Amino acid sequence: MKRWEIIFAAVGLLFLALGVRWIHVAELPKQETWLDAGGCHTPITILEPPAGVQPAGSVVVLHGLSANRRLMMYLAEDFAGHGLRAFAIDLPGHGDSKDAFSFARAQRCATAAVESLIRSGTIDPKKTILLGHSMGGAIAIRMADRDPLAATIALSPAPMTMPQRMPANLLVFSAGADLDVLKRTAQDLSAAAGGARTASDDFAQQRAFDLQTVPYSTHTSLLSDHRVAHQSELWAMRALFPNIAADTLTLNLDLATYETFGNGRRRLAGAIFGLLGILALFPAAVALVAKFSGPAQIESPGTRPTATLLLTEGAACAMAAVLLLMLGVPLHFLHLYAGAYLASVLLIVGILLLLLNFGFAMEYATFNGKRCAAAAFLGFATILAIGAWLNWQLDDAWLNAPRWLRFAGLLPVAWIFAFTEEAVLGPPRHGKQRAARFAIFLSLRLEIFLACLLAYYLLASGQVLIVILFVYLALFSILQRLATDALRVRTGSATAAALFSAILAAWFISTVFPLT
């Protein structure tokens, strides 16, 4: 093991220890349970205010498309830390929910969950705030027709059919760098509400409205933006206590319980530090696994296509894939909303690109059981370690039984694409050659995304989720390539590296996209 790998491992352990420490300092009383209502089996996390703090009210938190309740924990815990009971739920097909997803079912299950909490006396509608992001924001707004609550907060709400009546005390956030269609939705809500109304009398009469544009923010960054959290909590308090001056409520929030008792801002930082710690441990883990698999074999590639030819082939294959998918999605049987489409694109691109470069690609098609076993072990260890940490703190990345079935179906598809990618990129080199190879990789992935983007805007594919997830797809692609190259350098095996890469890809798709 090299010296820098040991140093990285030591730093990783330090970050993990620091992350765990900060998380425990910031912990709030929490209960994980399930709610059976309206034919839905809904996972729910209940967060209580710090010990000794009497709840001032409740907040029900609804996530967006391809998200989950754990992704909403920053906002939920911030509300709980400032004196409100927080109820974060998983909508059908998301997170721990095993119910099939559809937009209508998501609306129905969210409504049933809130009504069940009201009937049981768990929440008081006169003291309850409904907060939703994206799809969850649209659901929260439309629920006003059935379940009027004290206030509604919508973060970048998705396009919707307007409700018959506007929710009481509605606050809408719009991200500065959001999609145009989402910005228009926010403006339409403002027009329907008649513009801003933020006086104390407006809150008392339950007709307050405001549209706040958050500069330097994206659709998903709103979920961890302290400005959004602070303004949301102030809005909730003004709705619950309309007779108290806004300046007084602001001061109370600044001095409130979560900072005093739990140092709540540290939880998110601790979760991120822990994740960085796991990533820093990865080079040492690769070195140990590679040592088990034996000495690296020397890869001697033959003639490869030039960068220009390869990128031309990649663009042509990506466009051919989205055009073919107009006839139907071959992997529809996976029942993953947008995930089946993305996997089908990767499968078609992988097959076409492999056929175009079949001769030299077969030079890499060597099988070594020991190296492939090591790659599989490293792949599963990686997704289990990262998945467990994310599932504990940041996101729902731990596969439940239905998602493991999707993972099994995705793995061979992902391997075809991953092997083709390893073959056309060739073995990792050093210096400028390695940087150029990485640039080609990014360009190939970008071509696939742009093809999906064109399919959405020009071919009416309906796959908006792939567009929304661009940042996550880009970040995953970069980390996937760095990790795969680290293994390939140490083993000299394209097939083993492809297996490792395929495990990561199958895990990502089966985790992120909703079940249908």
Which residues make up each language-model segment?
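Alpha-helical transmembrane segments of integral membrane proteins
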Residues: 315-516
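N-terminal membrane topogenic signal
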Residues: 1-7, 308
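Alpha-helical transmembrane segments
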Residues: 13-17, 279-283, 415-419, 477
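Hydrophobic membrane-insertion alpha-helices, especially the h-region
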Residues: 5-20
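Soluble extramembrane regions of membrane proteins in the secretory/endomembrane system
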Residues: 22-261
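Early transmembrane alpha-helices of polytopic membrane proteins
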Residues: 223-226, 265-288, 313-327, 346-352, ...
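Membrane-interface capping segments at transmembrane-helix boundaries
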Residues: 23, 289-293, 485-492
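Cytosolic-side membrane-insertion boundary helix
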Residues: 246-283, 287-310
